[in-house]
Amino acid sequence: VFIAITLYLSRVVGFNDIDAAWIGGVFSAGLYFLPPFTGAFADKIGFRKAIILAFGLLTLGYFALGAMPVKIVVLPSLVVLMFGGSFIKSIITGTVAKTTTELTRARGFSIFYGMVNVGAFLGKTFAYPLRLNWGLQSINFYAAAMTLIALVLVYFFYKNVNADGEGKSLKTTWEGFIRVITNIRLVVLIFIVTGFWIIQHQLYATMPKYVLRTVGEGASPEWIANVNPFVVMTTVVIITSL
């Protein structure tokens, strides 16, 4: 959906380019800002309940986004997706952290990151023919179907790790966040890395529109953006083992 979100907001919903970019930017920022807090909540209720909630929110959000492409529905749907996605990030990283040892943790996270990029690669691979043959709305229904399947699989096969009641309170999490942003060296590093992410996210914010407007509607920004996840999923485990 990332690869099509600004296209969908402007071409289907009716936002202009600037508003669509702002909405997409806030959506992406929320996905990365919320995990410390949704992760604390996931610790409290248990990872299994939290991931079921997450996939439920994602299924609802994607379906509403595709079924009712009007501004009054799309914006709340994106908020639902933002919270659902932020749960996934924190739960999966938490599961890896709690089910690996110091010796296996690096390998565990590399496998997790590799699988994330397998999903990113396959998602954009299917998004291209869906966009051409059935339109941008179909990508949302495809995403809703995939998250619904994930919800069913999680319900039957995901075993909870021992997380209930172990998490920190939201107050403690917020205090930790304040300590982080007052660490000058870390903040400088974050700003440096942020420069990279600003450029990288243009693959989703502006590149699709640029390619389609300059090359034509038959062009494939999806495959251009696929270079990144392809390189990651084929090299991350190997590099980690070096």
Sequence positions of predicted segments:
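Symmetry-related core transmembrane helices of the 12-TM Major Facilitator Superfamily/SLC fold
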Residues: 137-156
